[in-house]
Amino acid sequence: MTILDLAEKSRYLPGLSGKSLLAGSAELSRNIKGYPFPGSADDKARKAVEDLAEKAVGRWNREEKDPLFPFPVAALTSNERALLEDKGFLPGGIGKKSHVVLFVNGAGTLSVLVNGEDHLLIRAAGSDPDKLWRTVSYVDSFFGKDIPYAFDQEFGYLTASPYRAGTALRMKAELLVPGLIGSGALEEAARNAARKGFSIRRVYDAVDMKHPYVALSNEVTLGVSEETLAARMAQLLEDLEVAETMGWSKVFRSREMALKDKVWRALGALKYARLMDGEETLAAAALIALGIRENMFPDKEKNLVSQLLDAASGAYVKETTHKEELDEEGEALWRAVLVRNCIESAGF
């Protein structure tokens, strides 16, 4: 399996073009008792952590039906690392540090990063917060039979960042919420999330009707059980979906023809443009999602929006075309080729 194979298997959630949820994940950080955090560890300590992790992964692969495949990060190209960062598998700025290994299953839905910000980062991707939590918890317990975790009776699981101490569980979701933005309801939604220990933040440079993408994640990990965090996440996603549906109904009714015009113009640009930058592609993907939401056209393969969001990534364009040295114009040219192919494959 190549990095590109992994990227294409771990797209945004398929079949949800009419919904606000685009991607979801649960991340569980763990550190090993008796070893310094990766950021302050020497090569010998990092190698020892890698060896312990490999032992646990080896037993997993022998006993479980969902094997994990290794990707030593230092052996990857800079563009491959950038693509894995875009996909959420790697933290930013990890570079070519020694003994950093990413283990991933064949579907790209389960991964274990060794020697990242913490010794282990167990990550599961999907749409159901409870299932995601149970998945990372199962892996955590399985690995815990081979690995002594760093745990404090007062502070819980110890992490490199004090903001993750306690459960060390981070629930995340990326959403498309033009209804909340256009109706002015996003601020109230953010306040509601904050009351439950979560935050709503921008994904890209701005949050507006052109780029209506937001990220939801928990800010509290100490003093709250994992089950409670997962349940709160599920409830917030449900509340946001209801609020988005109501908000979008108001926005669409008040600007129906203007919004439909924007959708058709976006489709035309995707179908015929010869240069497309990432920002324009993100904006067009949002409009196409809204067109599908309003049944203006079908999404036969249930993955058109996710393909367009992938194409917005410069690393994805370079990896797909095998042209890592593309300049800005070359990247825009090849992105336009990719999105035209997406539109053609979708039957437009």
Predicted regions and their residues:
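Conserved phosphate/anionic-ligand binding catalytic regions in large, soluble enzymes, centered on
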Residues: 156-175
